[in-house]
A protein has these predicted regions:
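Amide-donor transfer/coupling interface in amidating biosynthetic enzymes
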Residues: 4, 52, 58, 96-98, ...
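N-terminal beta1-alpha1 cap of cysteine-dependent amidohydrolase-like domains
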Residues: 1-109, 113-124, 129, 135-143, ...
Length: 270
C-alpha cells in the first residue's frame, strides 16, 4: 500500500527545504527508506557513499542534516560499525566537527548509532577512551521485534513533543553500556539518556521490556547540544499507520510513531 502524501499544513512553518545527507557504506541497507522518511517530512535527501564524502568533504557543508542509517556497514566485521567509525576518526573528524559546530543535526539509526558511538562523535573520547559503547545483546543473538519506548525529559531536538513510541528493533549488538557508573551518572545529569525501553502502556509486552540488557534501559542517546542523536530502534520503519503490526485492529493514529523524529529534524530549520 502506498504511503499517503504529507498534508501541506504540516509544512507551513518550514521556510526553506533542509537538505539531508544520507550516507551509506558497503552493507548499509536502510538508506532509501530513511531518506524517504525525511522527504515525507519535507526535507530533500541526497544519497552518498562514504567514499564520496571522503573525496568531497565540502559535500557536508551543502546539507543541514546528516544521517547514518541502519544496516551492517562493512559486514559488521571486527564489531558493528567499527570500520566506518574508524574512517570517521581518521579522515572525517574535521568535516564532522565543522558540521556540528555550524549548529546542524546528525542522526544515527541502529548501525548508525553504533558508528556514532564508536567514532566518539556522539560521546567524545577522553584520555581513557570511549565513554560508552554498544555491544552484544544479553541473549547473544540477533533480535527483531517491536518495543515500547519513552522519552526521558531530554534536550534532544529529534524528540521534541514525543512521550511514547512503538518502534521495531533489529540488531545483535544493541546493548548500551558505559565505561563506569560515573559516566552513566554524568549522562543522566546532562539529560543525554534521551530514549528508554519501557513496558507497554496496554500491558501487551511481547518480550522483555529491555530486549538487549542496556544499562538503565537506554535505547537512544544525544550529545550535550541535543543536536546529535543515536538510537537502536528504527523510526523509518514506522512512519505510516500501516507499518504498525496491529493497524487493522487498533486506532494507531494518522502517522506512525517514528515520523515525528523526522518531522522534528525538518522543523528545526523552519
Amino acid at each position: 500500500m502506498a504511503l499517503a502524501a504529507i498534508p501541506q499544513e504540516t509544512r507551513t512553518n518550514i521556510m526553506s527545504t533542509p537538505k539531508v545527507l544520507v550516507l551509506r557504506a558497503p552493507g548499509t541497507n536502510c538508506d532509501q527508506e530513511t531518506g524517504f522518511a525525511f522527504e515525507q517530512a519535507g526535507a530533500k535527501a541526497t544519497y552518498a557513499h562514504i567514499n564520496q564524502l571522503l573525496d568531497e568533504p565540502q559535500l557536508a557543508a551543502e546539507h543541514q542534516i546528516m544521517c547514518f542509517p541502519g544496516g551492517f556497514s562493512y559486514g559488521d566485521d571486527i564489531a558493528a560499525g567499527r570500520i566506518l567509525a574508524s574512517q570517521m576518526q581518521s579522515r572525517l573528524a574535521d568535516t564532522l566537527n565543522e558540521f556540528r559546530d555550524a549548529g546542524k543535526l546528525v542522526l544515527g539509526i541502529c548501525n548508525g548509532f553504533q558508528i556514532l558511538i564508536k567514532s566518539g562523535f556522539l560521546l567524545p573520547m577522553d584520555d581513557q577512551g570511549m565513554q560508552a559503547t554498544l555491544t552484544w545483546n544479553n541473549c547473544g543473538c540477533y533480535l527483531a521485534r517491536w518495543v515500547d519506548l519513552k522519552t526521558n525529559n531530554s534536550k534532544c531536538v529529534f524528540l521534541k513533543d514525543v512521550d511514547h513510541m512503538y518502534l521495531p528493533i533489529a540488531h545483535a549488538e544493541g546493548k548500551f553500556v558505559t565505561r563506569n557508573d560515573a559516566v552513566l551518572s554524568s549522562l543522566k545529569e546532562n539529560d543525554q539518556l534521551a530514549l528508554k525501553y519501557c513496558s507497554s502502556p496496554t500491558g501487551n509486552d511481547c518480550g522483555p521490556t529491555n530486549p538487549n540488557g542496556s544499562v538503565a534501559d537506554v535505547a537512544g542517546v544525544c550529545d550535550e547540544t541535543g543536536r546529535i542523536f543515536g538510537l537502536m530502534p528504527h523510526p523509518e520503519r514506522n512512519i505510516d499507520p500501516t507499518h504498525h503490526p496491529r493497524w487493522t485492529r487498533e486506532d494507531v493514529g494518522p502517522r506512525g510513531d517514528g515520523f515525528k523524529i523526522f518531522e522534528n529534524a525538518v522543523s528545526f530549520f523552519g
